[in-house]
Amino acid sequence: MDNIISGQAQKVEDVDGTRVQNEFSKFLKSFKGDKNELQYKTAMKELVQPEKNTIFVDMQHLYKFSNNLATTIELQYYRVYPFMCEALHLATLDGCDENERQQMFKKQLYVSLYNLDAKTKVRELSADKVGGLVRIAGQIVRTHPVHPELSRACFVCEDCGVSTRDVQQQFRYTQPTKCANPQCMNRTRFSLDVNSSTFVDFQKIRIQETQAELPRGSIPRTVDVIVRGEMVETVQPGDKCDIVGTLIVIPDIAQLSTPGLRAETSNQNRGRATDKSEGITGLKALGVRDLTYKMAFLACHIQQTESLVGGDASGAMEENDYLELWTKMSPEDRSVLKQMSDDKKIEKNIVDSLFPNIYGNHEVKLGVLLMLLGGVAKKSKDEGTSLRGDINVCLVGDPSTAKSQVLKAVEEFSPRAIYTSGKASSAAGLTAAVVKDEESFEFVIEAGALMLADNGVCCIDEFDKMDVKDQVAIHEAMEQQTISITKAGVKATLNARASILAAANPVGGRYDRSRPLKYNVQMSAPIMSRFDLFFVLVDECNEVTDYAIARRILDNHRSISEHTERNTVYKIDDIKKYIAFARCFKPKISDKAAEALVREYKKLRMSDSNNAATSSWRITVRQLESLVRLSEALARLHCGKEVLEQHVEKAAELLNKSIVRVEQPDIALDEDDFDNNIVIVEANKENQGGDDDMEHDGEKDETAKVDPAKLKISFKEYKQLSDVLVLHMRADEESQGEEEYDGVKQSALVEWYLTTIEGEMETEEDFNVQKTVCERVIHRLVHQDHILLEVEPGEDPTLCVHPNYVVSDE
């Protein structure tokens, strides 16, 4: 092997680098931690494993060992990093046997530094930071595939055959400047020996500065981050990360694109005679013209910032077992979580602590809390069918009802939440876009809002302002929780396991109570059915409520100006830990809970068929799945291993409030439809004699005396009256027996009702009003709602209750 010459032989020795190498080697071999044991001995032994190539070093340990060493590394990181890796390599070889030495000889090892005190904003990365150790934070917006990178190359001279080893590659294909053989004059003709060269994993990711660091009104800055070794594929788009590394300057690859030369390079040769042998030969010739450089960040350590209990990031929380997580917790965390789980008013206390600046709307806040907890995602073993566990919530309401405040509060609280506006977002911005990479010119997928919010919450404000084609784009993401893309030759199915919290304004700016929900919002039926909970927020004039809201707003202004914090039961960090721990539970549905689910679903279906005209939206099996998810979330809230009947009842109550709340238009009992029905009945009976006509005229005259304004009742009053009549008829049926029961005459039913409320009537006018209201409610129950059936039609029909009708519990 006489013709093999090391490329390192002609290098001038770096005295400072050698000193750092020796001191860092001593640090790895001798530093002892809190337990008076060698801190990094075990980690170095594990580097023998094929999949391990990185050792993680705490910067605080370096400062404790030697302040000069830590300061030198921090100020001249890029210069001394190869010496640190060499020190790690030699220290690892000292503890290996002969077989392990052969494996470790060609292995590239890395040092990952973390726990650096000072943090630099992405916007503050400038030329003076180049080469030093820097810590930055940002959100991942794009990840590239992992590629092999040529780290240390071995070149063979094509003239004399001498091999030059260990040629360091500086972010581009770098050949030796000349042949290592002193007698050979070759400077350009080299071939790469792939078998003798060292390749490492290489990945480029792009981060964007976080909203917390972004100055008001500024466009977010982005920076490309280069990761190697074990750091590749550790983060996904949407993760908020803490990155330690150094700022580097690299030539713009677009200027160095190969193969071939750019057309503009020939401009420098115009107007002067050139020899055929001349031309652009690479970097040297490229330096003749303007060479643009760009900055990138070479990372040695990257981790998700939102680490909660047990040291795990929130994205992996749901995969953990709660017992395993419990063992990783500190005693302080355990006592706090135990205290919270034993709290009987945990729902109210967490809700009040999460939304201290928003008054009232307890059901809305509870629904958002259950959305943060989520249900249990399931997948069948045979067919592979997936059932989503995430809960989607939509807030519909008048302006100034704190819809956007709820969204903003969730965005600030949730470790992985994306806030976007429906009007300003396109379909590609919500799902994913296919863009061309500036360097490789390959098409790569850039994550949209739903992908960035994977395993989190996507808050979409002004949902009703979205174009129809953009709403269609999220159909698949809301139910199947995937995004399918077929663009520019890229075919992929991406995960979008996010809960959607949407806020929408009603048509015309004000919610019309006389119309059901589906006519108040500009949403298609498929989109509406994909929401588990709808909450309608109506701005009503109420002296007590208005006073309380005004007090809360003024308190907020005073607390902000005086820099005082509102007293809450729980701290935000404690709630984050509790939710992360509760999401590890996967409660099973008990037999009683299953029966309760079926019973509540049947009630929803019956109420939908009974009030088809005024139903807020169609009740389908998706609402049954919503009940299951809400029940599981309630079980998780109490850290339960099983879904109980009380959880189902609470979930049904919440779902009913989100549905019934919008089914409250006022009932006008003097409508033209009612009068038309009376006219039709009278026209059919004109040939039955004048006495009947006289009777009808008398009834009409009596009805005419009633003020039409008093014939308009609220939906709540209509519901109460109909329930009273139905329950009375059911009681009669039970007392007489089903076989002997023939029904109740309408006149007898009206007379019974008037007798019941006799104490509330003072004048004859009150009597006429109540009688007319009762008669017209009965008429509506028969002809429109079909709750009552006419057993014997006629002027005074015999009535009975529809056998399938179920009286609601409200």
Curated annotation (Swiss-Prot):
Catalytically driven reaction(s): ATP + H2O = ADP + phosphate + H(+)
MCM domain: residues covered: 346-553
User: Which GO molecular function annotations are given, in alphabetical order?
Assistant: ATP binding; ATP hydrolysis activity; DNA helicase activity; single-stranded DNA binding
User: Which top-level enzyme class is recorded in the Swiss-Prot or TrEMBL entry?
Assistant: hydrolase
CDD domains in alphabetical order: MCM6 (cd17757)
Please tell me one Gene Ontology term that the record gives under cellular component. Answer: nucleus
Q: Which UniProt keywords apply?
A: ATP-binding, Cell cycle, DNA replication, DNA-binding, Helicase, Hydrolase, Nucleotide-binding, Nucleus
* UniProt protein name: DNA replication licensing factor mcm-6
Which lineage is the organism of this entry classified under, starting from the top rank?
A: Eukaryota, Metazoa, Ecdysozoa, Nematoda, Chromadorea
Gene symbol of the encoding locus: mcm-6
